[in-house]
UniProtKB/Swiss-Prot annotation:
<dbReference type="InterPro" id="IPR047873">
    <property type="entry name" value="Ribosomal_uL16"/>
</dbReference>
<comment type="function">
    <text>Binds 23S rRNA and is also seen to make contacts with the A and possibly P site tRNAs.</text>
</comment>
<dbReference type="GO" id="GO:0022625">
    <property type="term" value="C:cytosolic large ribosomal subunit"/>
</dbReference>
<keyword id="KW-0689">Ribosomal protein</keyword>
<dbReference type="InterPro" id="IPR020798">
    <property type="entry name" value="Ribosomal_uL16_CS"/>
</dbReference>
<dbReference type="InterPro" id="IPR016180">
    <property type="entry name" value="Ribosomal_uL16_dom"/>
</dbReference>
<dbReference type="GO" id="GO:0019843">
    <property type="term" value="F:rRNA binding"/>
</dbReference>
<comment type="similarity">
    <text>Belongs to the universal ribosomal protein uL16 family.</text>
</comment>
<keyword id="KW-0699">rRNA-binding</keyword>
<dbReference type="GO" id="GO:0000049">
    <property type="term" value="F:tRNA binding"/>
</dbReference>
<keyword id="KW-0687">Ribonucleoprotein</keyword>
<keyword id="KW-0820">tRNA-binding</keyword>
<comment type="subunit">
    <text>Part of the 50S ribosomal subunit.</text>
</comment>
<dbReference type="GO" id="GO:0006412">
    <property type="term" value="P:translation"/>
</dbReference>
<dbReference type="InterPro" id="IPR036920">
    <property type="entry name" value="Ribosomal_uL16_sf"/>
</dbReference>
<protein>
    <recommendedName>
        <fullName>Large ribosomal subunit protein uL16</fullName>
    </recommendedName>
</protein>
<keyword id="KW-0694">RNA-binding</keyword>
């Protein structure tokens, strides 16, 4: 089941700015281990789903995964070969606006080695640099550029 909003007030949105760090969602709230964004970027619903599948396949049937981001912003695209003007394009997909320091995914109920590898596999599906964090080391954490 794809991650899309059930209904929206406006089909087309402005692009917006991604200045600064995240205001909320900076700390692990549910699991023991998390994946923190080191850059700001749009992350599509397909990228989120690919990361989720990569994590759950590696963990087999152990543990629990929490997705802390949701793609609630629509983006538009005009057809190939269409000239400039004539209005905004049709909605093409959904993205989550992710700012740096935001926790993207959380894992609980597995060992640290399993969680570290599962989140590393998930990070390869995302277009940003990420970092593995634990509940005990909220401030620091080991860097996992990839």
């Amino acid at each position: 089941m794809p991650l899309v909003p059930k209904r929206v007030k406006h089909r087309r949105e402005f692009r917006g700015k991604m200045r600064g760090a995240a205001k909320g969602g900076k700390y692990i709230a549910f699991g023991e281990y998390g994946l923190e964004a080191l850059e700001s970027h749009w992350i599509t619903n397909r990228q989120i789903e690919a990361a989720r599948v990569a994590m759950t396949r590696y963990m087999k049937r152990g543990g629990k995964v929490w997705i802390r981001i949701f793609p609630q912003k629509s983006y538009t695209a005009k057809g190939v070969g269409v000239r400039m003007g004539s209005g905004k394009g049709a909605p093409a997909g959904w993205v989550a606006v992710v700012k740096r320091e935001k926790i993207l995914f959380e894992i609980g109920g597995v060992s640290e080695e399993v969680a570290r590898e599962a989140l590393r596999l998930a990070s390869t599906k995302l277009p940003i640099k990420t970092k593995f964090v634990t509940r005990s080391s909220e401030v620091g954490g080991e860097s996992n550029e990839g």
